[in-house]
Every structure is written in structure tokens, then in C-alpha cells.
Amino acid sequence: MAPKLLKTRLISPYQHDGVKWMSERELAPDYPGGFLCDEMGLGKTVQMIATMLVNPRPKTLIVVPKSIVGQWVSEIKRFAPSLTVYAFNGLDRKMPDSDAPFPSIVVAPYSVLPREPCPLTQVKWDRVILDEGHEIRNPKTKSYIICRSLMADIRWILSGTPVFNSMRDFVTLCAFLGIPRDYTQGYTEDIRKKYVLRRTKVDLAQHNKRLELPKCDFQNVELEMNPHERELYSEVFSYGQDVVRSISKLASVNHRQMELLEALLRVRQVLCYPQLYLDGMAKKEESDPVLWEHGSKKMDTLMELIQSHPKEKALVFCQFTGEMNEIQERLQKLEVPVMRIDGSVTGDNREERISQFKSGKPNSVFLIQIKAGGVGLNLQEATRVYITTPSWNPATELQAIGRAHRTGQLRPVTVRRLVYTGEDSLPSVEMSIMNLQEAKAKICAEILNDPRLESVIPNIPKTKINVQTLKKIFAV
């Protein structure tokens, strides 16, 4: 079902099947729309554009992460030039002139929704699409409340990872579609079969060898802290234990929640790069920063890994901008071409850096802050991916890996995640986070009926650490 107006060829047969299923769901009498949950890199965007051509509607709103507004607009203009598209940035607080023809499609970032007044909420939309729809999984946020309030006949959620932390997330996303919470909780399997379409790269390769992606080799690089790092980590970890131990004795911890979060942040900073911790404490105490002069096992290892493959482009996903600064400085000293995207890089500047990386030298490195560029980027030019520290959710890392390991990739992709190991007397928070990932991956696997998700991030230690609370993380 490739519409004649679509200026590209759909990959047969799965994208044809996807467009057919979506078109039928849009015409369904009960809760038109649903979840398109194809694995990262299988073309959810082009399938959605094709569906809009098959079932044309006057007013479609697409809500996306801020970092990929431009990409959506570009893809629509490229693949469906017959459609009118308008990027709403929220700055002028108004839609196109009322005297002008209303655009077929409005693309807006999630970040504009909570601002008041938001004209998007005043329009009766024919179709609302949430790309990376897991962004609204918390029902208490303004973004979720406003998305729920949007007036629309058809509602879509696009996400390769629609469940992050618990079954509640799935129930919340179903509620956006209009499906009652009680029904979702009682009939999860029925909901999945009727409203969720998910295909994986492995599934497609079994039916068509031409669609088989090259191998993705994922391994943890387990590191031991150098003596100076271990000494600092022990000190900060012990302080965190004291904070958690003290607060856990209180009847209510709400008023001291920030202390708990800061305790976790500080140990993560030490494990990422000790200078981050020293700078953070100096800022908090309004004192002069102390310079860390004792090296970093993680930074040294990352440089060695990058230098050992001088003919392969690499993506390096980071958590903190200070960490990115250190990596960038080290790479520049080694005369390695380096580009970066963090939360401060937007619009044309972002697209320019992507273009520079794509056309750059074979040993180019792209530094990406995982929350700013972990979704929506097509970077098949890279064949090596480095994750400098584990993320809370496995989905975040899967999204990042999917920037390189996706349709159009012709070479094997190597993924290395750097993680500090610990010991019984001094547990590693990074190892605890990986065990938390395992629990969340099981939830995704259950709801999407995809058991492979349980092991999609391999080499998680078999000895389970039930890190449901900071008390468990700090071994209190």
C-alpha cells in the first residue's frame, strides 16, 4: 500500500503491511490509532508519512522531541511534498494566520506544550501523533495532561520502547489513546494484539534475507578504578550511605527528596569522571574548584578503544556536558576529528554538525549527550558505539545504539559500554544500575510479547541486586 504521492520506495513487505495496518486502525470505530512500536531503525517515520497520504486529513499534529523537529519537517517535505508542513516553535505563541489555508501538518516539540497559552490545545485536530511517545509516560507531568486534553479523532504513539519502568507506563500511554485504564490492566494481551504493531530486525530477516542487518556486537568493558579514584569514590559513597540511612528512618522523605537524588548524582559523577564531582561540589559550596590530577581509568580506556580503530567512525554517548568537554579536549590533542551535540545545540547548527560527521574523515568521532541525541538521528556512517556510563533505562541505550544499527547499515556495528566494577565492601552504583535495567527490560518484553528484549543488553551480572530504592543501591 505505497501511495502514489510518496516520493520513496517502501521496503517490501513489512512497511507495506505497516501502512495497511495503520490505515485500517485509523478507520476503526473504537479508539482510532494505536502504537507503532517497530524496533529502532525500521522506518516508523516513513510509514507514518505514507499513512497520512493514504488517509488524508486536513489537520495533523505531530509532537516530537525538540531535537528532531527539523528532521520530521525535512522528511515530510522529502517524501510527501504534496503535504503542507509547519514547524511550531512556540515562540510567537500563535499558529499560521487564520486567513491562510491551515497547514496539513504541524510539527511541535514536547517542550512547548506546558507553556501558556498554548494555541495547539485550541485546535480540533483530525490526527495527533506522539513520536517517542514514551516521553509522556508520567501522568503527573504537564506534558501528559496537555497531550491527553488535545482534541483529536485519531491518536498515535510511535516508539520502539513504549514501556520504561512499570506496567503503569503502558496503562498511561493507553489512556492517551482513550482506552480506559481498568480495561488495559485487565486485558493487556487483548490490547497488545489489537492496538500494538511491533516488528523487529530479527523478525524481518527471517522472512527476507535482504532486510537482515549486519551483526551488532554488544559487550561491557569492565574496569577497576585506579587507587585515587577508589579512594574518592569510597568517601562519596560512604557519605551517600549516611544520607540514605538518616532519611530512611523518617516517616516521610518527600521534603528531603533532593538530598537523596544528590547523593546518587555525586557517586555517578565520580564514576563518570572525578572532575565532575569536584566542580559540582565547588559550585554548591561557592568555592574555587579543585583540579583532579590523578587520571581516569575510564577516560584512558575510551581513548585507547577509539585509537585502536582509526578507520571507523564512532559515536560516543555521554551523560554530562563536563564529561563531553574532557573527551573532546583529549580527542583534539590526539588530532581526532570530533563533533558534538548536547542540549544547547539546536536547529541548523545541529544539522550542520550531523552533515560534517557524515562527510568527515574515516576516524571522525561524534560526541552525543544521550538525552539530547539518543533519538531521531540517522548515523549509519558510524560502525562503533561507546556508552560511557549505564543509563537508568535500557530503552535509552537501545535508542542510542539504533542511531548506527538501523536499516541502511551495511557493516557490523560494535558497541562497548564502559562500567566500573565494585566489590562486596564497596559496591559499584553502575553495576546496580545495570541490574535495574534487567528488571525494566522484562517489563518491556512482557507487554510487547518480545522475550528477546530481556537479553537485548547482554552481560548483565546474574547475581541480582534489587535496586528498587536508593537504600538498596547504597547497600544500607
Residue spans of the language-model regions?
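A short beta-strand element within the Helicase C-terminal
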Residues: K124-W125, T172, L377-P390, T414-R417
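Inter-lobe coupling linker of SF2 helicases/translocases
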Residues: V107-V112, T121-Q122, K142-A152, I157, ...
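Catalytic acidic motif of RecA-like/P-loop NTPases
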Residues: G41, S111-P114, H134-R137, P162, ...
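A conserved SF2-helicase RecA2
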Residues: W392-I401, H405-V476
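SF2 helicase/translocase NTPase motor core
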Residues: M1-R9, P13, S23-P32, T45-Q47, ...
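Conserved Helicase C-terminal RecA-like lobe
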Residues: Q47, V54-P56, K209-E229, A251-F366, ...
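SF2 helicase motor core recognition
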Residues: R115-P117, S166, M324-Q328, F366-T383, ...
